[in-house]
């Protein structure tokens, strides 16, 4: 795909990217616009997250399609409903945050790329631009504790496993009882 939005459109419905024009423009505020050029719906925004949010808005309020975690694919109509009047939406919220330590340690610790890609798509469609990403924190701890003279066994006894990292990072537990 030529842009992340075209890739997102193709994951939603194969061939859908041909029905849209994506335009990225400079702006000091996050915004998206919906417009029409001939038979193509134009989604314009200042970054890819804003544009993805505009796509979600268009699908919901112009096409009647609601994407959700377990249903990130939809069959778009052969001819998309036209945007009759240009519309613009802005936000004054610079950061739109997602996740907390606990949600990251439930099943997310074991997700593969396909599952993460769906989550990243969902976040972009909903305007999320600051997801918690604590990936690799355990590596930092291993490095620091090693430099402080702890043995590998002591470090392994202290650092929690992937499904327990949230509680470990919040100081609620130490180590984990794996075989």
Model-inferred region functions:
Residues 27, 37-179:
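Feature activates predominantly on carbohydrate-active enzymes
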Residues 2-39:
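N-terminal-proximal low-complexity accessory segments that begin disordered
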């Amino acid at each position: 795909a030529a842009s992340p939005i075209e890739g997102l459109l193709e994951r939603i419905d194969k061939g859908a990217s041909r029905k849209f024009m994506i335009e990225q423009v400079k702006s000091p505020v996050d915004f998206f616009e919906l417009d029409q050029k001939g038979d193509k719906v134009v989604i314009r925004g200042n970054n890819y997250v804003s544009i993805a949010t505009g796509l979600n808005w268009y699908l919901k309020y112009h096409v009647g399609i609601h994407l959700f975690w377990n249903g990130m694919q939809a069959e778009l109509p052969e001819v998309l409903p036209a945007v009759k009047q240009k519309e613009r939406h802005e936000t004054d919220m610079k950061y739109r945050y997602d996740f907390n330590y606990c949600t990251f340690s439930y099943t997310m610790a074991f997700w593969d790329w396909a599952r993460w890609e769906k989550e990243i798509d969902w976040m972009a469609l909903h305007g999320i631009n600051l997801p918690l990403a604590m990936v690799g924190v355990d590596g930092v701890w291993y490095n620091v504790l090693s430099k402080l003279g702890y043995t590998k066994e002591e470090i392994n006894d202290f650092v929690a496993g992937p499904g327990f990292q949230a509680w470990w990072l919040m100081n609620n537990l130490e180590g984990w009882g794996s075989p």
